[in-house]
Amino acid sequence: MLFKSLSKLATAAAFFAGVATADDVPAIEVVGNKFFYSNNGSQFYIRGVAYQADTANETSGSTVNDPLANYESCSRDIPYLKKLNTNVIRVYAINTTLDHSECMKALNDADIYVIADLAAPATSINRDDPTWTVDLFNSYKTVVDTFANYTNVLGFFAGNEVTNNYTNTDASAFVKAAIRDVRQYISDKNYRKIPVGYSSNDDEDTRVKMTDYFACGDDDVKADFYGINMYEWCGKSDFKTSGYADRTAEFKNLSIPVFFSEYGCNEVTPRLFTEVEALYGSNMTDVWSGGIVYMYFEETNKYGLVSIDGNDVKTLDDFNNYSSEINKISPTSANTKSYSATTSDVACPATGKYWSAATELPPTPNGGLCSCMNAANSCVVSDDVDSDDYETLFNWICNEVDCSGISANGTAGKYGAYSFCTPKEQLSFVMNLYYEKSGGSKSDCSFSGSATLQTATTQASCSSALKEIGSMGTNSASGSVDLGSGTESSTASSNASGSSSKSNSGSSGSSSSSSSSSASSSSSSKKNAATNVKANLAQVVFTSIISLSIAAGVGFALV
């Protein structure tokens, strides 16, 4: 009886948490290449400030890099943000174990929206070994769940500067898959339609191709918006000399909103922010939707607008200069009633020297499918094997059997059906491949004591998917695979459908992601399977720690 009562209370609480009140700011929606207020259809320009310090708050001696979880600090800073005419803050990492309600309400009451990065330093797509895994997807979903019911959440970034030059463009396929899956998750959970986008660096070799890549394809795969961290205008420059004219011409045909996800070059100090007049002026507002100044807090990189000493705030010259510029803008405004959205589609970039990401995207991570596969194995890794030893085992086994079933290659657009599983599940899969290839005797499942035999089982809900995928894990499972028990229904596929730290003039060290190239041949996929495990291991450890901290009722520090 008590359980039923608690369940009803929990259901009611969840319902009311998702209901917007009269005091909530209107949600921001995307129409064509612009943002609009949902209540009256007037255009929304981002007047943003990056708002996250390396040591945003401290709890029990642990540094928690989450400014939205410290009401004392955010309530202190909101009046200063309002002096800067701020209507958006960007937050780079979220600690989902902490409470954000007080700060989010205070920001709402000040008419300030939030764009939150889904990644964090320990849970992001690694540009050197890109993967899109169950653990990473679960981490992103937790951030969505934490903030979805706040109407002043403008959107989410699924990555920040993951691809940062032409050598690691393949990583963008994994970020685009994250955008696709997070957006679908938002829909599946019946949350309001919250935009999901990407924040890029301004690399001359890749910027146009990368923008086209994230803007191309069907609505279910392309980004809802695109940010570029722009540091071209330094000191007393102008629209043409700075490069702004060229960038505006390059992005004029985008059918999604584009804005500066960071800006504010500090090669000349104090910063004058004369670019503000140009950004919100007639030369740029047809294409650009504003920008986010980097950054609020003064740190060693000297990008701060204010310095903080305890609870005292001191405004710097940059603060005064930016305030003077941002408070005199008056951009032209469109309205959804008269606005005609851009309908022209952007072509996905062809692969070549400066672009190597395939339009075929990684499959949607499905933990239930991984559980099905693991239960169907006869030979599995022993529980007492240290995860630090996995790489050695992968290297040896993948020289003996084809590990394509657990590999992911963003260049070739080839992804094993189990490429999103945990390293332990993947290791068991390839151990079982070796065991069966070698004859299936007990000695074939030894691996110097690292493996053990189990009774293989296949649940009825698993059999069809496992049969279609095949013993090597390289085929696709058609249709929706409902594997129940805490997993989402998704299409298990080895080829998912779809179209696809700066110096003084750069961005924050809290940038969320870094990643790399996978090879396409069978021999390369063996090597890739071994190297991809390193990124996955970090995610497994991080997720386990978070789970333990939640169970113990303690906060977890994102550092």
From Swiss-Prot:
Glycans are attached at residues 40, 57, 95, 149, 165, 253, 283, 321, 409, 495. The keyword Cell membrane applies. The keyword Disulfide bond applies. (1,3-beta-D-glucosyl)n 1 binds at residues 92, 119-127, 160, 294. One of its GO terms (molecular function) is 1,3-beta-glucanosyltransferase activity. GO terms for biological process: filamentous growth; fungal-type cell wall (1->3)-beta-D-glucan biosynthetic process; fungal-type cell wall organization; heterochromatin formation; regulation of response to endoplasmic reticulum stress. GO terms for cellular component: cellular bud scar; COPII-coated ER to Golgi transport vesicle; extracellular region; fungal-type cell wall; membrane raft; mitochondrion; nuclear periphery; plasma membrane. Gene3D superfamilies: 1.20.58.1040, Glycosidases (3.20.20.80). Its EC number is 2.4.1.-. Keywords: Cell membrane, Cell wall, Cell wall biogenesis/degradation, Disulfide bond, Glycoprotein, GPI-anchor, Lipoprotein, Membrane, Secreted, Signal, Transferase. It is found in: Cell membrane; Secreted, Cell wall. Changing residue 161 to Q: Loss of function. It is a lipid-anchor; GPI-anchor. Residues 529-559 form a propeptide. Residues 484-526 have a biased composition (Low complexity). The active site is at 161 (proton donor), 262 (nucleophile). (1,3-beta-D-glucosyl)n 2 binds at residues 161, 202, 207. A lipid is attached at residue 528 (GPI-anchor amidated asparagine). Changing residue 348 to S: Impairs the folding and stability of the protein. Disulfide bonds join 74-103, 216-348, 234-265, 370-421, 372-462, 379-445, 398-403. InterPro entries: Glucanosyltransferase, Glycoside_hydrolase_SF, X8. Extensively N- and O-glycosylated. The GPI-anchor is attached to the protein in the endoplasmic reticulum and serves to target the protein to the cell surface. There, the glucosamine-inositol phospholipid moiety is cleaved off and the GPI-modified mannoprotein is covalently attached via its lipidless GPI glycan remnant to the 1,6-beta-glucan of the outer cell wall layer. Splits internally a 1,3-beta-glucan molecule and transfers the newly generated reducing end (the donor) to the non-reducing end of another 1,3-beta-glucan molecule (the acceptor) forming a 1,3-beta linkage, resulting in the elongation of 1,3-beta-glucan chains in the cell wall. Involved in cell wall biosynthesis and morphogenesis. Present with 11000 wall-bound molecules/cell in log phase YPD medium. Belongs to the glycosyl hydrolase 72 family. This is 1,3-beta-glucanosyltransferase GAS1. It comes from Saccharomyces cerevisiae (strain ATCC 204508 / S288c) (Baker's yeast).
